[in-house]
UniProtKB/Swiss-Prot annotation:
Function: Globally modulates RNA abundance by binding to RNase E (Rne) and regulating its endonucleolytic activity. Can modulate Rne action in a substrate-dependent manner by altering the composition of the degradosome. Modulates RNA-binding and helicase activities of the degradosome.
The protein, known as: Regulator of ribonuclease activity A
Keyword Secreted in annotation: no
InterPro entries to which the protein is assigned, alphabetical: RraA, RraA/RraA-like, RraA/RraA-like_sf, RraA_gpbac
Amino acid sequence: MEYNTSELCDMYLDVVDVVEPMFSNYGGCSSFGGSISTIKCFEDNGLITDVLQEDGQGKVLLVDGGGSLRRALIDGTIAELAVSNNWEGIIVYGSVRDVDALEELDIGIQALASIPVGADGNSVGEVDIPVNFGGVTFLPGDHIYADNTGIILSPEPLDIE
């Protein structure tokens, strides 16, 4: 489904939180949204791989990677896993790699930057907890909408019809 965050802000500005503009699009889908699952990890993507093995229909994985630009939390293999399990998108407060492969995949991916160095895979971190970055607190189950213009968050799904 296509989302236009500008139009959604015009209709729901009193309901949504707007994430500070710092993200770039790396996936093949420039517009995506859904109910969020959260992960907090630092330079380690083991938990990301674990969570993306679950059915992601209607969900967006939101990763608080501490804003690290030193290690990529998402790569082509992890993104392919997300696609195969029907995730709508991934938002990473951190870095990605394999950007040419990511842009070919049918999934939305936004991150701060790209870097060729991969992350550790020790599964260190926390899942389904509140996380805060970009001036917004994200709670598991909140609804997120993203496009090339920005990212917005709502406690309930927005009526976009």
